[in-house]
Curated annotation (Swiss-Prot):
NCBIfam families: PRK00702.1 (NF001924), rpiA (TIGR00021). The gene is rpiA. GO terms for biological process: D-ribose metabolic process; pentose-phosphate shunt, non-oxidative branch. The active site is at residue 103. Catalyzes the reversible conversion of ribose-5-phosphate to ribulose 5-phosphate. It comes from Vibrio atlanticus (strain LGP32) (Vibrio splendidus (strain Mel32)). Keywords: Isomerase. Belongs to the ribose 5-phosphate isomerase family. This is Ribose-5-phosphate isomerase A. It catalyses: aldehydo-D-ribose 5-phosphate = D-ribulose 5-phosphate.
Amino acid sequence: MTQDEMKKAAGWAALQYVEEGSIVGVGTGSTVNHFIDALGTMKDKIKGAVSSSIASTEKLEALEIKVFECNDVFKLDIYVDGADEINGSRDMIKGGGAALTREKIVAAISDKFICIVDGTKAVDVLGKFPLPVEVIPMARSYVARELVKLGGDPVYREGCTTDNGNVILDVYGMAIENPKQLEDIINGIAGVVTVGLFAHRGADVVITGTPEGAKIEE
């Protein structure tokens, strides 16, 4: 089974958590794209979706799934999204697709976060994948200096502007032993919009695509 087939297995397995008549939180990325395809088979049974990115919104609308504004929804039953890394405590690094802030907002209004990944994303310690930080453009250099003080090696993601009009610093070289603490510290730096650590709001369910099919951990 290829990596993409494992992503597809995870994405389609998440469909069992979608209830009829609900509004579904939808993340961003290659694994989520498979979930959106699956969701398209239920489009007449759900009210619609809240999307974490312009890219996902376009894919949802192409399948004729109604997309609601986040501000118009009080809460969501589920949010389905991928991760760049996930540890045994279900803390995650997200933001490889630069949608981390909107992903964090949609996750915050959701009762259940369902993380869909292939087996390559599971790690013992977060940080091998560079940690994305969304930054107000005028603060880029200052934030980079502060991240160096924390032991990281921040690299400006060239040619990337987030859906919010900001920039991304990818922080290399961090072995993240205490994700919640680091999330608080980086979010406290002036000019940081958010860091791609999802530790305070980790995953509730993990669906991993494996060569044998989807493995579900609740």
